[in-house]
Amino acid sequence: MYDVAIIGGGVIGSSIARELSKYKLKICVLEKELDVCCETSGRNSGVLHAGFNNKPKSLMAKFCVEGNENFDEIAKELDIPFKRTGKLVVGFTKEDKEKLIEMKEQGEINGVKGLEIIDKDRIKQLSPYVEGNFALYSPNTGILNPFIYTIAMAENAVENGVKYFLDNEVVNIKKSSDEDNNIFEIRTNKNIYKSKWIINCAGLNSDKIGKMLGIDEYTIHPCRGEYFILDQKVGRYLNMPAYPVPNPKMGGLGIHLTPSIDGNVFIGPSSEYIDSKDDYSTTKEVMDLLIKDGGRIFPHIRKEHFIRNFSGIRPKLVAKEQGGYDDFKIELREDISNFINLTGIESPGLTSAVPIA
């Protein structure tokens, strides 16, 4: 019998496991993959966001700003590599500049510090190989390795007594009651676990877990983003993430370039709604789009710089027809006692993981 069963061993589930491991609780994490951080948590740009892209008063804005401000301390505690590089959101047209000013004002409402609108000369001072007529400069944006980060939190939780059960996909949940307690019976493909509490951190499958307990109001719409990884020869020319002005109707922040903590460069992601939650394929059409759009901001890339490609899937609560973003859903359910439901945790989930916990 466990006090708490966490479903999902990504960055959110592992952050919660680490936080709860500080208390005298018997905790397990049920992860359907063979390791932690195999899905959304590990298939992204690895950016520590500042919080200017999110609507004021939203949970996304609140947790992103808090997560950014406190990340130096977290990185030190976990002994993980992290670099506060800054970030440029570059524009070319009058409409772009108006949007950048709006983003700056929104960020300041959210509590983001140090934002500036800068001209072309200042762009060249900060990142000489990035193109743009003007930009929003965010000095507090950073980069990290999401795998190393998530694994470090999971290892810390395990050191404190948390049990991780990998390759354990939840297939059914029943809520029974004995004379003293309400007990969840969680059936996986491998075993049956009993727990007093459940925390649903299942990411792409969080709606599926909710439906096992009668929660029908949420549907996750998988939105795939494809990336190229560039050789480290290119990495020395890009010292901070460079983004375009985002299209509010799209499911992401636009095709951008991000230096990795290891010295490579990511181009991407695209934004394409798909039917399957496990279709991590890549397509030539999208790869051509990455080259075209990425080259507008950073024209120094060549095909010989490409090492490999990959994709990730965003767990979006908004359908393709609606576009844009919904807020994080984090609920202590009144209709299901002892059940905490987290769903729609897309970007900036990586930045927000510790405050969410």
Describe the function of each predicted region.
Residues 12, 35, 205:
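Conserved Rossmann-like nucleotide-cofactor binding loop
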Residues 62-65, 90-99, 137-155, 165, ...:
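Short beta-strand to alpha-helix junction loop
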Residues 21-42:
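Glycine-rich FAD pyrophosphate-binding loop
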Residues 1-12:
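Beta1/beta-strand and adjacent pyrophosphate-binding region of the FAD-binding site
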Residues 146, 281-356:
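C-terminal catalytic lobe of FAD-dependent flavoproteins
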